[in-house]
């Protein structure tokens, strides 16, 4: 698992000197941080370390080894266990594997956070699977970015009702969340069939350079059930990050295909191959949900606001990496669009969905409210001056209107200037 990560990140000039979760935390916190971090132990990394990309259930010995890794990480301070079941290698895990691993996290008081298996053809089935894992493991659960795909064939009302029934009738601790945008990020290479990119970077590059693979992939885009076609086709996907073609950022794939003078399939291959071993960081954005479904999800009182972004910065080793606009200004967009403009929420409720609600869902005691004996994590902003400075072709930009940020009682940002203070802590602590 570590070798896969290193291969995809080698151009960040980062030294991965750790082999265990505790060593990772030491590397993360020893230089000091300006923010608090509640790390989750990732199922995908553990499965890769034990089984690679094997598309089968683990043997008893393999499962015990994975359980030991989860136990080790939880003992080191992880806040919980996370899965991404729509993607490899998580998609190869069955319920027995997930319950066993989640139970280890639960024994340490951890939570279970999941990108569920499917939000389209088997949306309800995937939610029920997650509820069963939460139920049998005996831990709180968080179902992430839960809006249905635009082409989902199951009613969202019924999915939400199933979640509320589990909460109300069984007292299961279940939270849900979403980012406040109909657009979602993704690596360009994942438009291709999983067998192309599920491997170490060098092997993936060998496949990407094969004319036979190009032809096989071309056939998949003729299938009307193809994920890309169901989301509107090539004109509905936009490039957001490419080191080799920064001038094309913001253009859709139909336009890029015309500029390259090749068909859609070759366009994808040309984009990902141009960045060599860094191909996984060639990024796109696409429609995540309909405005109606997103609004319905946001209106749920148990729905927290999250970014679905990554840690990045417009300077340093990550300055050229763009995930999507959600890494910056997502809170500003939520307040501007849904609190100020549409008035779907009071300001107080909007802030609750970004503070005490997610803190409680993650079991972060003493966080998320301005109360005596609570940690002084405080943000002061000017409602009138709030401005989202990101755009589709320039998604990395800080907002206006944030006057002060205090973390654990120390000022880390004031009037747009970083104080260089490093008061961040690992949570829960």
Residue spans for each PLM region:
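Metal-associated gating/positioning segment near the N- to mid-region
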Residues: 1-19
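Active-site neighborhoods of metal-dependent hydrolases
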Residues: 28, 34-50, 56-60, 66-87, ...
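Short, glycine-/Ser/Thr-/acidic-enriched flexible segments
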Residues: 86-88, 118-119, 148-149, 180-181, ...
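Acidic, glycine-enriched loop/beta-strand segments at the rims
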Residues: 254, 280-288, 294, 342-351, ...
């Amino acid at each position: 698992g570590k070798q896969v990560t290193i291969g995809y990140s080698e151009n960040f000039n980062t030294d991965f000197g750790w082999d265990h979760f505790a060593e990772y935390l030491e590397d993360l916190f020893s230089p000091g941080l300006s923010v608090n971090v509640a790390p989750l132990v990732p199922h995908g990394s553990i499965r890769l370390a034990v089984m690679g990309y094997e598309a089968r259930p683990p043997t008893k010995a393999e499962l015990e080894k994975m359980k030991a890794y989860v136990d080790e990480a939880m003992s080191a301070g992880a806040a919980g266990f996370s899965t991404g079941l729509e993607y490899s290698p998580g998609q190869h895990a069955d319920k027995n594997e997930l319950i066993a691993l989640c139970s280890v996290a639960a024994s340490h008081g951890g939570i279970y956070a999941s990108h569920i298996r499917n939000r389209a053809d088997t949306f309800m089935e995937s939610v029920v699977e997650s509820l069963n894992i939460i139920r049998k493991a005996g831990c709180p659960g968080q179902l992430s970015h839960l809006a249905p795909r635009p082409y989902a064939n199951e009613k969202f009302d019924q999915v939400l009702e199933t979640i509320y029934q589990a909460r109300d009738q069984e007292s299961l601790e279940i939270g849900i969340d979403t980012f406040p945008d109909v657009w979602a990020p993704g690596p360009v290479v994942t438009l291709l069939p999983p067998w192309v990119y599920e491997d170490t970077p060098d092997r993936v590059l060998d496949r990407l350079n094969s004319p036979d693979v190009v032809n096989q992939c071309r056939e998949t885009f003729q299938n009307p059930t193809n994920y890309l076609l169901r989301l509107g086709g090539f004109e509905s996907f936009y490039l957001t990050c490419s080191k080799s073609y920064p001038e094309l950022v913001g253009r859709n794939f139909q336009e890029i295909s015309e500029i390259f003078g090749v068909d859609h399939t070759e366009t994808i291959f040309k984009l990902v191959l141009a960045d060599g071993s860094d191909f996984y960081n060639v990024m796109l954005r696409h429609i995540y949900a309909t405005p109606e479904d997103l609004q319905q999800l946001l209106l749920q009182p148990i729905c927290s606001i999250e970014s679905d972004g990554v840690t990045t910065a417009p300077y340093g080793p990550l300055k050229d990496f763009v995930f999507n606009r959600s890494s910056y200004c997502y809170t500003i967009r939520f307040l501007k669009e849904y609190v100020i403009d549409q008035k779907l929420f009071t300001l107080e409720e909007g802030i609750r969905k970004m503070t005490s609600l997610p803190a409680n869902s993650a079991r972060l005691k003493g966080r998320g409210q301005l109360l005596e004996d609570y940690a002084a994590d405080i943000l002061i902003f000017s409602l009138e001056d709030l401005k989202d400075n990101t755009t589709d072709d320039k998604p990395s930009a800080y907002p206006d209107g944030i006057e002060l940020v205090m973390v654990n009682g120390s000022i880390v940002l004031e009037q747009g200037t970083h104080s260089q203070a490093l008061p961040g802590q690992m949570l829960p602590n």
